[in-house]
Structures are given as structure tokens and as C-alpha cells.
Amino acid sequence: MSISMDAGPGFAALQSWSSQVAAFGNSNQTVVDRVSPEMLHLIDAYWYQFPPMNPLWHALLGFTIGVLGFISMMGNGMVIYIFMTTKNLKTPSNLLVVNLAFSDFLMMCAMSPAMVINCYNETWVFGPFACELYGCAGSLFGCASIWTMTMIAFDRYNVIVKGIAAKPMTNNGALLRILGIWAFSLAWTVAPFFGWNRYVPEGNMTACGTDYLTKDWFSRSYIVVYSVFVYFAPLLLIVYSYYYIVQAVSAHEKAMREQAKKMNVASLRSSEAANTSTECKLAKVALMTISLWFMAWTPYLVINYTGILESAPISPLATIWGSLFAKANAVYNPIVYGISHPKYQAALYKRFPVLQCHSTTTDEASSVASGTTVMEEKPTA
């Protein structure tokens, strides 16, 4: 007796799936096979040892980047719109917040759509020059974001630690800082175009970044020096600023408690004390934002150092996570500032009432204000 099997849609799908599995295990195929010939000169020989990635990973990455890009562009776009159209939010310090949102917005505008398309095609499809521009954009906007956050930390330090003795920031001062941030970032970004390292496809072949697999130590030195000025130095400066911010607030709170004991009262809740409490809360919010940024970029830094030091193998799948975490930082900032800034919330709900889920009129809610706003309300004697 013979048994015949109807080759219906289910059986055809099973055969297709089996052929894909066989392809992934076929040593004759590599992750580079889908790359166009004009891109091959940018790809390191190291990646030829890896088989093609499962299309599921490309689909998952493309979907995730698409969602993150939409959230980031909407969130940062709202931050820019609200801060620039609300009179009591147009302060010198808040210009730094707008610059941060602007940098994050441009990052996702430049990188998210391209990566979604590449993930759909399972390889880079825009050619070598676009690959270089893509890597350039990631470097430029990433550097601008972290140094903007560093300037925000210095602004907090100047007001909270130095108090009324601090020289208040002016609009010209804020604009000068922003101009310096972009000039500094651009200088680091264009260096690979002049021979100090280069921008090449990542191992997943859907994104581009610096060449951390090069054997040339002159090119490797770019990654080392870049990480010093764009990762480690800002990190130390931010830690320094917030260390003294926490110290100043802690000393103030201790003095307030001692004074309350002398006056035989439960606490002293003057306007100044309330403002200090607000500044303390905002310092925590800003510190959380910066911590999230470093959490986002650290995986990519680790991948770069692993490559130049050849300390461990790097798989194409690992480069996916580096790209994903790096781009996710553009989503954090509008969420954190939107939650923590009641004047931003009030302006947002006034323009978009549908976004208001509940009333935030309690004293506790209103006390969690942005340090940038508090700074501008303090006397500048």
C-alpha cells in the first residue's frame, strides 16, 4: 500500500522552512552574500566566516527600530514644539533641553527609516556613500547628545552648588555652548572621511559604523581617542557635577533638620526649602536620563573595544544589540522630561488634551519640576 501526501500550502511552507534552515547551516553561504558588489571593499574579511542571519532577527530588529523611531520622533518633536512655543519655558537653560531633543530627533529621522528598509532587504541597499553618511550621522548626533547632557549637568551644578553666587546663564551663553557642542561633534564625525578610521557596514549588514576590525593601529587610535573625549571624559565630568550636587543638597537638608529641632517644629517648609527639594528631585531625574544614555551606548563601546583589542569573537547578532541599544537612547529623553516637568505637562495637555489621563494638581506632583525652570525663577542677584 502506498501513502500519498498532498503537497498543500502547509507542506509547501514546511519545505520552504526546511530549505532556509539548510541554508543557514550551509558553510558555502555567508552573511555577506546579499551585499551588493560595490559595498564589498568596505567589508572586513572577518565577516565572511559567518552564515546568513535568520530572517526572523532582521524582521524583529526592523520592527523594533521602526517603533522606537516613531516614538522618538513624536516625543522629541513634542518637546521641541512645547518648549519653543511656551513663553515661561523659553529660558536659556531650556535651550539645552531643546538642543538635546533636536539631536535625538535628527538621529532617528536619519537612521530609523534606513535601517527598517535594510532589515526588510536583509542587507545594506543604499550604496557605500550612504553607508558613510549613515555612520557619520550616528556619530554626530550621539556626540552632540552626550555633550549637551554634560552642559545640562554643569548648569545644574552652577545653580544648585554655587547658589545665588553663580553667574546666571544667558541666551547668548546657551547658544554659544550649543554652537561649541555641534562644532566639536562635527570635528570628530568628519575625521574618518580624511583617513582616520572609516565608516563600514556592521556585522549584521543592515547598519554602518566605525571600523573596529581594522589591523591598522592608526585607525584603531581613532576609536580609543574618540571614546576618551566622547565617552569617558563626559562621564567623569557628569559624575563630578552630580557628586557635588548631591553633597550640597544633603548639607542643606541636614541644616534644615537641625534648625527645625532648635525651633521645636517638625520641619521648615519655606519657599527656599521647597525650591531646594525640587532641585534635588530634578537632579535625580537628570542623572537618571544621563545614566540611561550611557547604558544605551556602553554595549556599542564594548563591541568597538572588543574589535580593536581582538579580545573575544564578535558575531553579527551581537552587533544588532549594539545598534539597538545605541538608538534606544533617543527615546528616553522626551519620556523622562515629559514625566518630570509639570510646566511642560501643563503646556502639553493644553495643546493636546487627549493625552491627559489624570489630574496632577496635588502639591507633590507640582513639586517635581524641571531644574531648568527652577533655575530661571531663582533670583539672579
Curated annotation (Swiss-Prot):
Expressed bilaterally in dorsal and ventral anterior protocerebral cells and bilaterally in the dorsal posterior protocerebral and lateral posterior tritocerebral cells (at protein level). Expressed in the larval brain but not in the subesophageal ganglion or thoracic ganglion. Glycans are attached at N28, N121, N204. Disulfide bonds join C131-C208. One of its GO terms (cellular component) is membrane. Residues 84-96, 155-173, 243-284, 340-381 are cytoplasmic. GO terms for biological process: phototransduction; visual perception. InterPro entries: GPCR_opsins (IPR050125), GPCR_Rhodpsn (IPR000276), GPCR_Rhodpsn_7TM (IPR017452), Opsin (IPR001760), Opsin_lateye (IPR001391), Retinal_BS (IPR027430). GO terms for molecular function: G protein-coupled receptor activity; photoreceptor activity. It is found in: Membrane. It is a multi-pass membrane protein. Residues 1-62, 118-133, 195-221, 306-316 are extracellular. Its main location: membrane. Keywords: Chromophore, Disulfide bond, G-protein coupled receptor, Glycoprotein, Membrane, Photoreceptor protein, Receptor, Retinal protein, Sensory transduction, Transducer, Transmembrane, Transmembrane helix, Vision. Pfam families: 7tm_1. The chain crosses the membrane at residues 63-83, 97-117, 134-154, 174-194, 222-242, 285-305, 317-339. PANTHER family: OPSIN. Belongs to the G-protein coupled receptor 1 family. Opsin subfamily. Visual pigments are the light-absorbing molecules that mediate vision. They consist of an apoprotein, opsin, covalently linked to cis-retinal. May play a role in photoperiodic photoreception. This is Ceropsin. It comes from Bombyx mori (Silk moth). The lineage of its organism: Eukaryota, Metazoa, Ecdysozoa, Arthropoda, Hexapoda.
